[in-house]
Amino acid sequence: MIAVAILAAGKGTRMRSNLPKVLHQLGGKSLIERVLSSTQNLSPSRQIVIVGYSADQVRTEMQGWPNLEFVEQTEQLGTGHAVQQVLPVMEGFEGDLLVLNGDVPLLRPGTLQKMLATHQEHQNAATILTAQLPNPKGYGRVFCDAQMHLQEIIEDRDCTPAQRQNQRINAGVYCFRWSALAKVLPNLKAENDQKEYYLTDAVNYLDPVMVLDVDDYQEILGINDRKQLATAYKILQDRIKDDWLVAGVTIMDPDSITIDETVELGTDVIIEPQTHLRGDTKIDTGSRIGPGSLIENSHIGTNVQVLYSVISDSRVGDNSRIGPYTHLRGNVQIGEKCRVGNFVEMKKTTIGDRTNVAHLSYLGDATLGTQVNIGAGTITANYDGVNKHPTQIGDRTKTGANSVLVAPITLGANVTVAAGSTITKNVDDDVLVVARQRQSVLPGWRPISSKQTEK
């Protein structure tokens, strides 16, 4: 049985923010959510979050995790003091306790699984995750024997020049046999310059204690300021894009592209520069996205091309072409083999297969049939100042340039709307509708000059 305790009481002063540090976002999730997610493959029986600064705000933001338990550290007196707060709620627990920092969001689930397996296989009282840093300056060094049993931890300022050659540092992730840790936690003393209780001091009372090196030292990056948050985001993006490159996706300029973890990509998808894929987005096989596009919470079908466009909460059917400079939002449904082109905006609109909206149009609250052609400058006037109203357009209907369809309105099938028309009444099937004032010509007319008006 495994319990998880996450240290999340700190303010994060160096973030220079009113938001608790663990609630800052990294790739669409808060730091603490990422830490929690990394533990889920362990199937923990208990998940305890130790809160302090803005405790109520952290509780509120974590309501999506219904099985969490919260304990409060009213004074932030060190890591050992934080774990002491779980003693009352862990009474009678038999198993292991995994202790993690809420601001270390890049740990891989496999690393924690390996750590727990090592801990249980060797029946350790404690197992400490360590990392070999290229430049460990400022970090305490961890010393162990050839069998990876801990010998001692020495702070950087106390190391000899020879000891500073050791690159192994404490990653701040621990797995304890709870029955052993519970006995020593009350004995911790704040005998240091900071007058804090350190969890590493508890390790001195435990035996056996082993260390385990993480495979990639970037996993243990802690977030203390915005610069480190940006570094973590780049590491996270590199992981995601590397995985997709291996899976058969072409990413033409990885440094200019961002992809959320929740995105799904088919084989032979091509992502061009300056493209951003966010949220619950799915892009099917053979589609080409970008350059310069943003797609969020949308499903793009097979062999679709999206160029310099923004798509959110929408769906695009197979073999369609979107853009350049198209904006689809709020549950737009595009059929197969459609063309939606330059400077077109759609909101809450469905268009059937082989329908074209090629230029300079706004369609809102509209339903279009198949093989419809919307002329340049066509507008659905769907808002009367109070309510939104629907527009229905039948199959194979064509609207001329600069048409206005004043909703609520229905156009039948095979209708042709003359250019420049403003349509205010329903139109039956198979007709030409012209709704514009006849052109008037006044021979010999001249405008009054400005000099004449001054007289």
From Swiss-Prot:
Lineage: superkingdom: Bacteria
Pathway: Nucleotide-sugar biosynthesis; UDP-N-acetyl-alpha-D-glucosamine biosynthesis; N-acetyl-alpha-D-glucosamine 1-phosphate from alpha-D-glucosamine 6-phosphate (route II): step 2/2; Nucleotide-sugar biosynthesis; UDP-N-acetyl-alpha-D-glucosamine biosynthesis; UDP-N-acetyl-alpha-D-glucosamine from N-acetyl-alpha-D-glucosamine 1-phosphate: step 1/1; Bacterial outer membrane biogenesis; LPS lipid A biosynthesis
Localization: Cytoplasm
Keyword field: Acyltransferase, Cell shape, Cell wall biogenesis/degradation, Cytoplasm, Magnesium, Metal-binding, Multifunctional enzyme, Nucleotidyltransferase, Peptidoglycan synthesis, Repeat, Transferase
One of the GO BP terms on file: cell wall organization
GO molecular function: glucosamine-1-phosphate N-acetyltransferase activity; magnesium ion binding; structural constituent of carboxysome shell; UDP-N-acetylglucosamine diphosphorylase activity
InterPro entries: Bifunctional_GlmU (IPR005882), GlmU-like (IPR050065), GlmU_C_LbH (IPR038009), Hexapep (IPR001451), MobA-like_NTP_Trfase (IPR025877), Nucleotide-diphossugar_trans (IPR029044), Trimer_LpxA-like_sf (IPR011004)
Major place of residence: cytoplasm
Sequence positions that bind UDP-N-acetyl-alpha-D-glucosamine: 7-10, 21, 73, 78-79, 140, 155, 170, 224, 329, 347, 362, 373
Residues at which Mg(2+) binds: D103, N224
Region (Pyrophosphorylase): 1-226
Cofactor(s) in the UniProt record: Mg(2+)
Entry annotation: catalytic residues: H359
Residue numbers binding acetyl-CoA: A376, N382, Y383, A419, R436
E.C. numbers: 2.7.7.23, 2.3.1.157
Catalytic function, reaction form: alpha-D-glucosamine 1-phosphate + acetyl-CoA = N-acetyl-alpha-D-glucosamine 1-phosphate + CoA + H(+); N-acetyl-alpha-D-glucosamine 1-phosphate + UTP + H(+) = UDP-N-acetyl-alpha-D-glucosamine + diphosphate
Cofactor note: Binds 1 Mg(2+) ion per subunit.
Entry GO terms, CC: carboxysome; cytoplasm; membrane
Region (Linker): 227-247
Family statement drawn from the similarity comment of this UniProt entry: In the N-terminal section; belongs to the N-acetylglucosamine-1-phosphate uridyltransferase family.
NCBIfam families named in the record: glmU, PRK14360.1
Subunit note: Homotrimer.
Designated name of the protein: Bifunctional protein GlmU
Species in which this protein is naturally found: Acaryochloris marina (strain MBIC 11017)
Top-level taxonomy: Bacteria, Bacillati, Cyanobacteriota, Cyanophyceae, Acaryochloridales
